[in-house]
UniProtKB/Swiss-Prot annotation:
GO molecular function, one term: aspartic-type endopeptidase activity
Naturally occurring in which organism (per UniProt): AKV murine leukemia virus
Cross-referenced SMART domains: ZnF_C2HC
Gene transcribed to yield this protein: pol
Active site: 565
Protein name: Gag-Pol polyprotein
Length: 1734
């Protein structure tokens, strides 16, 4: 056996607990891993001889320590605890280290080295820690070793440290029994960071060039002594205090205490700052400290010498043994503290202060301390400053707990309260709070009281309900329903009427029933409670009924107990069963008759079959009754046995009745499925863990909790819970309770919150909770969905497997757990006082509604079932999320596989629903399909769902229909072609216009669903055949597989081709159709071999495609898809049946696709690209487009070799391609009827004429994206011009040739002519427009009789050779052509008559336009767009306003706004008397009808009497019901003026302007903004301003000018001789009579002046101005028909208000040829209408 080598490192690791104890004694903490790392990897790199296995050599340890404690960036502060611990182990070795440490030699006693004078050499400088320069003192010639007095050098019994020395320092150990003194040259200088251990262990060191300065303390003998900082103290200060940036106050206080207690030197201050501050923080502190240096005058100084003397950055030469040196050090510390305080001031952030709030259980005193600390930390304010007490007090009140803050705000004389008073009051409130135990007791007591009250109320209601039920049941004698009143009356039996003195008991007279002697006396026995008394068929009272037979049935998903009542003619429901019909019937009972309604017809599944039945709805019936109607349909048999009555069917089986809702009626069409797993089935008992009914909630045991990753920028979202009805809350409460009990929901506190949405289940009163997780889904990372596609999922099911098992996992998502870190994402609010829940709940399992839940569960279940698939390779297992399909070839294999699957699911923790299970059957339903015998069918339920949808009325309903029907498109041949008319209506912004085409397509899709065939399941072991056909741009096909000699369809495919492919010839369209359907068929064939059969030779086309039709990209795509010989093969050309898309038995006529394509490649068959030998002309065309002076110029030219035939400038911005097309088209036009060779150097124009033009035309000139191609009009013009020449050859030549051939000369001349035309000739857009529009050439002109008559009047001549009329040397354009041209031009420009006329005059048209000006005016006037937008030029003459005949009878009112609104007055209510012009104005704060009524009744009526007429605009204050009601009660005729017509209220509107102008001038003159104060002056000015008749309103009203007082005339004696009051009134009456009468006559004369009426008449069409137009909205609306008129206004059809004539303009309508003639008859009330023109 070998021996292990023990090293210092391994020794420490073996005794690690002792190492940790030693480190703890040094106040540090060490970790084993870092201990090994530093010892073996870090310290050996220091270059001091440290071995990788460690050492206990003290010299090496001290050298490593000096490296660790190095100042600046070269130090290692993180290694301080570890080297200090190594040092402690070496100095005081524990027992397990002593054998490895050499014994220490006892040092010889030597005398300590006394301080010596400083060196004359300059001290060495350091960037961060400059050396201290010792003071220069005379060096003694001979050092004194012994003292003069002969005393001992050091008191060995003293515990004081040795005296402070300049060069050396003697150290003593802790016991004081030894002393050491060595020279400074023997040991290197220690690091700046020192510790108390050095006083015991470090050998003394001294530098001949520096002096050491240490923290000073005064010893017992009066000498300064050095006490260095401990490394553990520095380490603890660093780690146990926040950083300076985080909390500068706390660190400043710490440094201040250290400076006060330790009195550090300059070096130790640097050491302290370097340890506690970062580099940036230290620089900031030093800078602030230097700013605080003050000069001789006591103010901060910036003199460098004074700043450096007081606060040096390098080590100063201060002598700390002198008072002056110590004073320097004290000043340095003070400045350092000032720098710390100034650097620690953070910017003001009151938001942080406001964020400090009192905690629920925090005392006010503690809260106040936190608040003050926030003030100190985030603001420059001192919270202890008396000036800041108010701010602190307000923050304390507002940010206290709500209950404390509210009570503090209500304190009396709050301003006089000090902060201490507020704290004491808050403490008193805080101490009076309820304790948690008291609060819990109070809540418990209130809950118990509430529960007691609820229980008492329920008991009372139950008792009342029992009494009412017994009372009604005892009174009910029969339930008879009759549709006829006479039957009801005939069947009644009335109680015999009693006389007044007749006994009701014995029927004798003379006494009443209570005094009857025959009535038995004694205690009353218990009254028998009969629940129902029945009648026989004749209505007589039967004997006492037997025990009541009851049957529990399912109605609308809810169990309902029916009472079998053979006396009830009809069955009765007591609760609302859904919609009721309009039919009703009388129900006669003991208490009388009452009418009740019937329910709508319901499909009821009885034991005898399906029937339609309607129940009678009787809410006050005590029980639902099963009457004779349903008993008859049931063929029920009632047996009376000893145990009671039993109701059974005709075969003796128990009866069950199911009532369905209307939306579930489609299920009645389904065939009867195999019975589900019954509770007594062996499947349940054999596999109890696999079923949700017996195994409880599932839990996937092999799946780890899921962690939901968030997006990088996601932040928590909190959405409040929506209001929830009480019914909905009670509906979801049981579900929440169940989930809480199962642990799926747990209480939580989360920053996330999303609302809970209760969704009512159809046909029931039950609710289910649904959480709205849309906002959470936005913030969660997306994962790639791996859920299988239902479209091709069944492709993996071979037809040979015909035994199926279908399982539906219940609550599947709840089987997966959520990680606790992800659970808060799905929190929601829930409050239930009964359960003691008020807060948030969250999910511990994967929730529903989360976007990634299906993918996560599908992947987890796939992983768990992987072993099952491996162990059962003969079985087919398909999984779609939580729906599982198991298929086998035989029944035995299916049963064994099902058992194994159930066992596996149970062991894995998944639970299946027994109610939905379909076990070992040959026919099952899976994913909406019916699987049977290797085929899949559309279920009848799916068909009925589509058939039951009503005709769509909106795009959304149409999308729903197409989505539902699109699910079934595999069963519908040509579905895309059928639905083509419907898809355009689903686009956004399209008008939903449902026409005959849409209705036809809608019905065809429904009809196709009814005849949907069965499709075979894809068999991946057999090849597939794809039959493809194409028709009008729609690809149709059927995917088949051979089944014996027949072809069985697998899927019907259809799709619309893109616009480019739809424009190809039929053979190429077939290629595109095959490519499209091949891609869709690949989803079902899963890459298996495919044979394509089509009525075209597609393979040859794909191998040699015509490059003129296909682009390179399409060609490559088709070849890669269709020439894959391993997967795609082409069969022989076959003819297909259009109905079935299968081949016809007879052979079709073959055709050559390549030959057909060659024939259809161009537009003109004789068009060639070779020169014609006998051509009449050989021309050269060219188009040029270039930039000149920042503008793109363009031109086109047609030339020969030597001369220019045609050259024209084109509009700026024309492209070169367009110019080439225009030039080529012009050449073809000029060569009409001739043989032409035309050369062009444009590949674009050449290819368009020869190849692409026909392609563009076939596909409707659209691109592949469905947009119009560029240069559409030029391409169409070129295609039409190609047929004009007799023979034509378009030849391509190279551009810019330099040879001397005829081709080169002609091309150069054409290019030069095009450039010169573009530069010299201005573009003529009008001529260009006419020339480019081929229909407007003379060859197309057709003249009418009216045109010919006009031409003869003008004296025009007819050109026989050219076939058109000529006038003034120009061809004459007919009137109809002129109208079409000008109408097109106006629709392009929408210019007015004058602008269009000037444009045509300047353009010098080559044609004479017949009736141009008249047609132009008509086109401009009849344009609807211009009429809606253009302003009206019509001017309406001024009208006449009606005035009053005396003052105060007729007023005009209006509100005007005056800003700024002082004292809340923003409005001015102005009254103007129309007779005198007198004005009354009242400042108001609101513009309301209440203000108007108040001023009218309180101001106008008492002073001027009741007005007769009031006039105003249509403001809400005047049109409101309040104002109008007041006017009606007072008999005032309130006239509302036309809307948006200020002139109608001109007098008051002008007064508003006058008052505002006057107030503006007065405010400027007075220098105040108080317009309310200046309003009387403005009114005085308005009332005393002369009007149109030279009189002021004051003079008209009072008959004299206002009295004026001359304040400068002291003699007031003239005023004393005033006449009597009576005489003054008589004079006033005379003056008023003389003034008012002439004034009223003047007003009356104005009314008699004729007013020019507006030109509108009844029946005219007018446009009405839109007064409030939005952006890009026309300013006129209409046109409207005029119904009534006045001289200034009119009323139109469709607008209730009168409209001023200035707000309308005439609408020009195109003339309509009259088709009816109106004739008068003799009867004035009759007219005769006759068809046809008069």
């Amino acid at each position: 056996m070998g021996q292990t080598v023990t090293t210092p490192l391994s020794l420490t690791l073996e005794h690690w607990e002792d190492v940790q104890r030693i480190a703890s004694n040094q106040s540090v903490d060490v970790k084993k891993r870092r201990w090994v790392t530093f010892c073996s990897a870090e310290w050996p790199t220091f270059g001091v001889g440290w071995p990788q296995d460690g050492t206990f050599n003290l010299d090496i340890i001290l050298q490593v320590k000096s490296k660790v404690f190095s100042p600046g960036p070269h130090g290692h502060p993180d290694q301080v605890p570890y080297i200090v611990t190594w040092e402690a182990i070496a100095y005081e070795p524990p027992p397990w280290v002593k054998p490895f440490v050499s014994p220490k030699l006892s040092p010889s006693p030597t005398a300590p080295i006394l301080p010596s004078g400083p060196s004359t050499q300059p001290p060495p400088r350091s960037a961060l820690y400059p050396a201290l320069t010792p003071s220069i003192k005379p060096r003694p010639s001979k050092p004194q070793v012994l003292s003069d007095n002969g005393g001992p050098l050091i008191d060995l019994l003293s515990e004081d440290p040795p005296p402070y020395g300049g060069q050396g320092l003697s150290s003593s150990d802790g016991d004081g029994d030894r002393e050491e003194a060595t020279s400074t040259s023997e040991i290197p200088a220690p690091s700046p960071i020192v510790s108390r251990l050095r006083g015991k262990r470090d050998p003394p060191a001294a530098d001949s060039t520096t002096s050491r300065a240490f923290p000073l303390r005064l010893g017992g003998n009066g000498q300064l002594q050095y006490w260095p900082f401990s490394s553990s103290d520095l380490y603890n200060w660093k780690n146990n205090n926040p950083s300076f940036s985080e909390d500068p106050g706390k660190l400043t206080a710490l440094i201040e205490s250290v400076l006060t207690t330790h009195q550090p030197t300059w070096d130790d201050c640097q050491q302290l700052l370097g340890t506690l501050l970062t580099g940036e923080e230290k620089q900031r502190v030093l800078l602030e400290a230097r700013k605080a240096v003050r000069g001789n005058d006591g103010r901060p100084t910036q003199l460098p010498n004074e700043v450096d003397a007081a606060f040096p950055l390098e080590r100063p030469d201060w002598d700390y043994t002198t008072q002056r040196g110590r004073n320097h050090l004290v000043l340095y510390r003070q400045l350092l503290l000032a720098g710390l305080q100034n650097a620690g001031r953070s910017p003001t952030n009151l938001a942080k202060v406001k964020g400090i709030t009192q905690g629920p259980n925090e005392s006010p005193s503690a809260f106040l301390e936190r608040l003050k600390e926030a003030y100190r930390r985030y603001t420059p304010y001192d919270p202890e400053d008396p000036g800041q007490e108010t701010n602190v007090s307000m923050s304390f009140i507002w940010q206290s707990a709500p209950d404390i803050g509210r009570k503090l705000e209500r304190l009396e004389d709050l301003k006089s309260k000090t902060l201490g008073d507020l704290v004491r009051e808050a403490e008193r409130i805080f101490n009076k709070r309820e304790t948690p135990e008291e609060r819990e007791e109070r809540v418990r007591r209130e809950t118990e009281e509430k529960e007691e009250r609820r229980r008492a109320e329920e008991e009372q209601k139950e008792k009342e309900r029992d009494r009412r039920r017994h009372r009604e049941m005892s009174k009910l004698l029969a339930t008879v329903v009759s549709g006829q009143r006479q039957d009801r009356q005939g069947g009644e039996r009335r109680r015999p009427q009693l006389d007044k003195d007749q006994c009701a008991y014995c029927k004798e007279k003379g006494h009443w029933a209570k005094d009857c002697p025959k009535k038995p006396r004694g205690p009353r026995g218990p009254r028998p409670q009969t629940s129902l008394l029945t009648l026989d068929d004749q209505g007589g009272q039967g004997q006492e009924p037997p025990p009541e037979p009851r049957i529990t049935l399912t109605v609308g998903g809810q169990p309902v107990t029916f009472l079998v009542d053979t006396g009830a003619q009809h069955s009765v429901l007591t609760q609302n069963p859904g919609p009721l019909s309009d039919r009703s019937a009388w129900v006669q009972g003991a208490t009388g008759g009452k009418r009740y309604r019937w329910t709508t017809d319901r499909k009821v599944h009885l034991a005898t079959g399906k029937v339609t039945h309607s129940f009678l709805h009787v809410p006050d019936c005590p029980y639902p009754l099963l009457g004779r109607d349903l008993l008859t349909k049931l063929k029920a048999q009632i047996h009376f046995e000893g145990s009671g009555a039993q109701v059974v069917g005709p075969k003796g089986q128990p009866l069950q009745v199911l009532t369905l809702n209307l939306e579930d009626e489609y299920r009645l069409y389904e065939t009867s499925a195999e019975p589900e797993v019954s509770p007594g089935s062996t499947w349940l008992s054999d596999f109890p863990q696999a079923w949700a009914e017996t195994g409880g909630m599932g839990l996937a045991v092999r799946q780890a909790p899921l962690i939901i990753p968030l997006k990088a920028t996601s932040t928590p979202v909190s959405i409040k819970q929506y209001p929830m009805s009480q019914e909905a809350k009670l509906g979801i409460k049981p579900h929440i309770q169940r989930l809480l009990d199962q642990g799926i929901l747990v209480p939580c506190q989360s920053p996330w919150n999303t609302p809970l949405l209760p969704v009512k289940k159809p046909g029931t009163n039950d609710y289910r909770p649904v959480q709205d997780l849309r906002e959470v889904n936005k913030r969660v990372e997306d994962i790639h969905p791996t859920v299988p596609n239902p479209y091709n999922l069944l492709s993996g099911l071979p037809p040979s497997h015909r035994w199926y098992t279908v399982l539906d996992l219940k609550d599947a998502f709840f089987c997966l757990r959520l990680h606790p870190t992800s659970q808060p994402l799905f929190a929601f609010e829930w409050r239930d006082p009964g359960m003691g829940i008020s807060g948030q709940l969250t999910w511990t399992r994967l929730p529903q509604g989360f976007k990634n839940s299906p993918t996560l569960f599908d992947e987890a279940l796939h992983r768990d079932l992987a072993d099952f698939r491996i162990q059962h390779p003969d079985l087919i297992l398909l999984q779609y999320v939580d729906d599982i399909l198991l298929a086998a070839t035989s029944e035995l294999d299916c049963q064994q596989g099902t058992r194994a699957l159930l066992l596996t699911l149970g062991n894995l923790g998944y639970r299946a629903s027994a109610k939905k299970a379909q076990l070992c059957q040959k026919q099952v339903k899976y994913l909406g399909y019916l699987l049977k015998e290797g085929q899949r069918w559309l279920t009848e339920a799916r068909k009925e769902t589509v058939m039951g949808q009503p005709t769509p009325k909106t795009p959304r309903q149409l999308r729903e229909f197409l989505g539902t029907a699109g699910f079934c498109r595999l069963w519908i041949p040509g579905f895309a072609e059928m639905a083509a008319p419907l898809y355009p209506l689903t686009k956004t912004g399209t008008l939903f216009n449902w026409g005959p085409d849409q209705q036809k397509a809608y019905q065809e899709i429904k009809q196709a669903l009814l005849t949907a065939p069965a499709l075979g399941l894809p068999d991946l072991t057999k090849p597939f055949e794809l039959f493809v056909d194409e028709k009008q741009g729609y690809a149709k096909g059927v995917l088949t597989q051979k089944l014996g000699p027949w072809r069985r369809p697998v899927a019907y495919l259809s799709k619309k081709l893109d616009p480019v492919a739809a424009g190809w010839p039929p053979c190429l369209r077939m290629v595109a159709a095959i490519a499209v359907l091949r891609k869709d068929a690949g989803k079902l064939t899963m890459g298996q071999p495919l044979v394509i059969l089509a009525p075209h030779a597609v393979e040859a086309l794909v191998k040699q495609p015509p490059d003129r039709w296909l682009s390179n990209a399409r060609m490559t795509h088709y070849q890669a898809m269709l020439l894959d010989t391993d997967r795609v093969q082409f069969g022989p050309v076959v003819a297909l049946n259009p109905a079935t898309l299968l081949p016809l038995p007879e052979e079709g006529a073959p055709h050559d696709c390549l030959e057909i394509l060659a024939e259809t490649h161009g537009t003109r068959p004789d068009l060639t690209d070779q020169p014609i030998p006998d051509a009449d002309h050989t021309w050269y065309t060219d188009g040029s487009s270039f930039l000149q002076e920042g503008q793109r110029k363009a031109g086109a030219a047609v030339t020969t070799e030597t001369e220019v035939i045609w050259a024209r400038a084109l509009p700026a911005g024309t492209s070169a391609q367009r110019a080439e097309l225009i030039a080529l088209t012009q050449a073809l036009k000029m060569a009409e009827g001739k043989r032409l060779n035309v050369y062009t150097d444009s590949r674009y124009a050449f290819a368009t004429a020869h190849i692409h033009g026909e392609i563009y035309r076939r596909r409707g000139l659209l691109t592949s994206e469905g947009r119009e191609i560029k240069n559409k009009s030029e391409i169409l013009a070129l295609l039409k011009a190609l047929f004009l020449p007799k023979r034509l050859s378009i030849i391509h030549c190279l551009g810019h040739q330099k040879g001397d051939s005829a081709e080169a000369r002609g091309n150069r001349l054409a290019d030069q002519a095009a450039r010169e035309a573009a530069i010299k000739t201005p573009p003529d857009t009008s001529t260009l427009l006419i020339e480019d529009s081929t229909p407007y050439t003379p060859a197309y002109f057709h003249y009418t009789e009216t045109d010919l008559k006009k031409l003869r009047e003008l004296g025009a001549t007819y050109n026989q050779s050219k076939g058109y009329w000529v006038f003034q040397g120009k061809p004459v354009m007919p009137d109809q052509f002129v109208f079409e041209l000008l109408d097109s031009l106006h629709r392009l420009t929408h210019l007015g008559y004058q602008k269009m006329k000037a444009l045509l005059d300047r353009g010098e048209s080559p044609y004479y336009m017949l009736n141009r000006d008249k047609t132009l005016q008509y086109v401009a006037d009849s344009c609807t767009v211009c009429a809606q937008v253009n302003a009206s030029k019509a001017k309406i003459g001024a009208g006449v306003r009606v005035r009053g005949h005396r003052p105060g009878s007729h007023w005009e009112i209006d509100f005007t706004e005056v800003k700024p609104g002082l004292y809340g007055y923003k409005y001015l209510l102005v009254f103007v008397d129309t007779f005198s012009g007198w004005v009354e104005a009242f400042p108001t704060k609101r513009e309301t009808a209440r203000v108007v009524s108040k001023k009218l009744l309180e101001e106008i009526f008492p002073r001027f009497g009741m007005p007769q007429v009031l006039g105003s605009d249509n403001g809400p204050a005047f049109t409101s019901q309040v104002s109008q009601s007041v006017a009606d009660l007072l008999g005032i005729d309130w006239k509302l003026h036309c809307a948006y017509r200020p002139q109608s209220s001109g007098q008051v509107e002008r007064m508003n302007r006058t008052i505002k102008e006057t107030l503006t001038k007065l405010t400027l003159a007075a220098g105040t903004r108080d317009w309310v104060l200046l309003l009387p002056l403005a009114l005085y000015r308005a009332r005393n301003t002369p009007g149109p008749h030279g009189l002021t309103p004051y003079e008209i009203l009072y008959g004299a000018p206002p009295p004026l007082v001359n304040f400068h005339d002291p003699d007031m004696s003239e005023l004393t001789n005033s006449p009597s009051l009576q005489a003054h009134l008589q004079a006033l009456q005379t003056v008023q009579r003389e003034i008012w009468k002439p004034l009223a006559e003047a007003y009356r004369d104005q009314l008699d002046q004729p007013v020019i009426p507006h030109p509108f008449r009844i029946g005219d069409s007018v446009w009405v101005r839109r007064h409030q137009t939005k952006n890009l909205e026309p300013r006129w609306k209409g046109p409207y028909t005029v119904l009534l008129t006045t001289p200034t206004a009119l009323k139109v059809d469709g607008i209730s208000a009168w409209i001023h004539a200035a707000h309308v303009k005439a609408a020009t309508t195109p003339p309509i040829k009259p088709s009816w003639r109106v004739q008068r008859s003799q009867n004035p009330l009759k007219i005769r209408l006759t068809r046809g023109a008069p």
